[in-house]
Amino acid sequence: MCGRYRRTTAAEELARRYHIPIPPQRDLPISWNIAPTQDVLAIRFNPESKQRTLDTLRWGLIPSWAKDPKIAYKTINARVETVDTAPSYRQAFMKRRCLIPVDGFYEWKKVLGGKIPYTISMKNNSPFVFAGLWEGWNDPSTDEWLRTCTIITGEPNGFVRGIHTRMPVILSEEHHNAWLCGEAGKEILVPYPADRMKAWPISARVNDPKNDDPEIVAPVELESVARQEDSPQLL
């Protein structure tokens, strides 16, 4: 699963990088420790204007038919294996897709006696995007619309497998348009190339979303973990 990530590239730079002509609705501050139910930036496609937009969505998808918004705690991730058939996601998979800009994400490696958090990112330190879905939900108590999203997860590549049994689906740039416009299906939702990624162990401070600062990703020396055969390469 993916339950924590960071977005440290400013919205203005993301708009330039991902060819978004329309200014973001709201310039969310960067965050080193984004957690479920928080507001996040997402890239969507407007079929009328034929343009991309950079919008604010709530992480944790609430289906349009949901009675209780607390379902969002269970829908932060959509499994690629069932994303096109599961009741919570199948309509969004057909009509409401998004890209979620990221600079790195966190996964916890099970070790004897507990778990060790790792930060995972690109070797060239560039931002990248998760494949996501979004939905609109009308709050019956206020009659206000809330737009929410989920991150699609799948099998890990050979690199991330040394840390966790799942990983978010990362889309290469050549697939961005096809995903947003609905021109491609699950065939592009595959593990990202392992040789482009890096990871290292970090402090357990990341466990608390209140800890939101650059020190979150400071490397931690874990010689005993690094000696294990299935440990990822530390870069």
Language-model features: locations:
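Short linear sequence motif anchored by a di-proline
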Residues: 1-235
